[in-house]
Amino acid sequence: MVFTLGPGYICPMISRDIKSASDLLRSGRVIGMPTETVYGLAADALNPQGVAEVYRVKKRPSFNPLILHVASLAHAQSHALVFYPQAEALAKVFWPGPLTLVLPKKAHIPDQITAGKSTFAVRVPNHPVALALLEAYPNPIVAPSANLFGTLSPTSADHVVRNLGDQVPLVLDGGDCNLGIESTIVGFTPEGIPEVFRLGSITLDQLKEVCPDILFRPGTHKEVLAPGMYPKHYA
């Protein structure tokens, strides 16, 4: 049985371990998943029990949305009610990679992960372990940083185990994260004009090379429209 894996079990990325991770996600458990930015606390985005476990383990406010992680641009498009032309342009340049897009969501995306908003955040991570899991698992995965809300984000499997080991039955060890900085988040106006919600690994200049008209208005939005906009966010 997969649940015989002890708390904080770290494994190399092989097909058996991807199956073990998938079984845990399917049962509503959380796991540690590496990405190029930080290690994420992963759960099945369409499993209410798993999503609730993410919020519980992290002690994350329920009004702070989560980011969907998917395997490809096509998968992201399948969850979006509208995928703006400039969103596609950005995705084609920066995916897989540390760019999160905030777009109108289809009805099957639960309010539980969007904090009741009509938009959802999505990205394709650039890490072989994360991509292997996302390609093997049928549903999108939420994976905020695997730490208590407001504390330093983990960049190694050992860091996850030290902080959350008794709460996480399995951590996929993908080595140290290449970047160690959260993704850049870009939303869109109703007209499809991109707007930076959070700067991260991708700079404003890099974004402007693809979308010269991109907006950057720090402090304009008081509402938490996307992950990373909460004043005390580093999670």
Model segments located where?
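Active-site-adjacent structural elements in enzyme catalytic cores
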Residues: 3-235
